[in-house]
């Protein structure tokens, strides 16, 4: 019988492509008895272009590589100091719709930021989480065979300047924010556990096993 347990992998700082490939392989080979997983990772600097991404939103990538991704959404930037959380969930088994998962991920971030005294909100017209008009978290998902992969990217204490080389998520002039603007002591090391605790709470607190790479 299936046990509701989630494997949480802390992968540290990794290049984007091998992690993306591993995520695809996991999703393609999982079956009904495969446990869901959550991967916590930071990436070396990279622009990722979403499945429907338009080239004109990549303004001047310079020395940062641009990699095509099959997630939803337009172009975004990943770099050290940004906490990425990939959610590899069997949505059918969890009786979660795609829209419900997006809402759950946005609420995870809103709740995490509220604990830090930062008031944040989602926007109906542009997925993600915002503080005022500034975007602090990007979302992009893909569903295959009833299972989700990709996830969210929360700006913690990263260098935001590479976002100026793109129209983030397809919005010209979209300003970005990071947690350390309000909480200078914030690091991915102290934000990741809060993020994890909040998503597990919204998934009804399943058992979990924490695995470090």
Swiss-Prot record:
Q: Which GO terms describe its cellular component?
A: cytoplasm
For this protein, the record's InterPro entries field holds:
aa-tRNA-synth_II/BPL/LPL, BPL_LPL_catalytic, Octanoyltransferase, Octanoyltransferase_CS
Q: Where does substrate bind?
A: 71-78, 138-140, 151-153
Q: Which Pfam families match?
A: LplA-B_cat (PF21948)
One Gene Ontology term of the biological-process aspect is:
protein modification process
Q: Which reaction does it catalyse?
A: octanoyl-[ACP] + L-lysyl-[protein] = N(6)-octanoyl-L-lysyl-[protein] + holo-[ACP] + H(+)
Look at the named UniProt entry and state the broad enzyme category this protein falls under: transferase
Annotated Gene Ontology MF terms? lipoyl(octanoyl) transferase activity
Mostly located where? cytoplasm
Q: Which residues form the BPL/LPL catalytic domain?
A: 32-207
User: What's the EC number here?
Assistant: 2.3.1.181
S-S bonds: none
User: Which HAMAP family does the record cross-reference, listed alphabetically?
Assistant: LipB
* UniProt family annotation: Belongs to the LipB family.
Further facts: In the reaction, the free carboxyl group of octanoic acid is attached via an amide linkage to the epsilon-amino group of a specific lysine residue of lipoyl domains of lipoate-dependent enzymes.
Name of the molecule in the record: Octanoyltransferase
């Amino acid at each position: 019988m299936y046990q509701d347990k989630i494997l949480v992998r802390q992968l540290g700082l990794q290049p984007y492509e091998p992690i993306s490939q591993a995520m695809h392989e996991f999703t393609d080979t999982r079956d009904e008895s495969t446990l869901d997983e959550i991967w916590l990772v930071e990436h070396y600097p990279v622009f990722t272009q979403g499945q429907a991404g338009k080239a004109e939103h990549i303004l001047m990538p310079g020395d940062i590589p641009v990699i095509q991704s099959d997630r939803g959404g337009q172009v975004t930037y990943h770099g050290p100091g940004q906490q990425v959380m990939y959610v590899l969930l069997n949505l059918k088994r969890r009786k979660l719709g795609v829209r419900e998962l997006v809402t759950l991920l946005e609420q995870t971030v809103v709740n995490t930021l509220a604990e830090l005294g930062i008031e944040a909100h989602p926007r109906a017209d542009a997925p993600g989480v915002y503080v005022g008009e500034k975007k602090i978290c990007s979302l992009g998902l893909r569903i295959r065979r009833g299972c989700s992969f990709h996830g969210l990217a929360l700006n913690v204490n990263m260098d935001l300047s590479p976002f100026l080389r793109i129209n983030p998520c397809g919005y010209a002039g979209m300003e970005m924010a990071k947690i350390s603007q309000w909480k200078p002591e914030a690091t991915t090391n102290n934000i990741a556990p809060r993020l994890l605790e909040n998503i597990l709470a919204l998934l009804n607190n399943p058992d979990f096993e924490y695995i470090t790479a």
